[in-house]
Amino acid sequence: LCHMADQKGIPRYTGFLSDREQALALAAMNRAQCRFGEFRGGWPGAERRVLCLEPPDSWSEDPVAVLRLRAMAAAGDKTPGHRDYLGSILALGLDRACLGDLLQDPDNPAVTYAFVLQDKTDFIASHLTDAGHCQVRAEFCDAVPDSVLRGPERTLREATVPSLRADSVLAAMMHTSRTLAADAIRAGRVEINHV
């Protein structure tokens, strides 16, 4: 992809990549001595990001767009969460690579911002009608409020563990047994350095 972008002088973009896929793409870029690639996710703290290969002297475009998803929940009803929106968008027949981060507005739980590939915005906006048990309206968004872009709060935890084995550390962080932690690792629900 890097060589094709360089030879033809036109930009190339991947879909949204997970942390592991980004690490692999970066290693491949380094092996290919590609010096004009960068990752963009639509906001500075993005976890899922698009690899943008834009050779010098080529045009540049932003492959990431933002949709505001507004749940039309009745008073007292549960608003859709991350899993509900993710499931509803993927149920439209789209691949996970078309969808980046989903950020819920902390000031208004009925609103979630979805970072999506630019060429999928019209499709999602016109076909996404519900998520969870609520009707949803998707609309284009130019600016995401700063309160949303702060991202989730992360907490630092300290623990004393008998050994630095992954199951031991995970058990201490999850406040569970090493057996349950080992089961989570075997099931592939836990990654260490994207592996």
Model-derived features: positions:
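Ferredoxin-like alpha/beta domains used as RNA- or RNAP-binding modules
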Residues: 1-168, 172-173
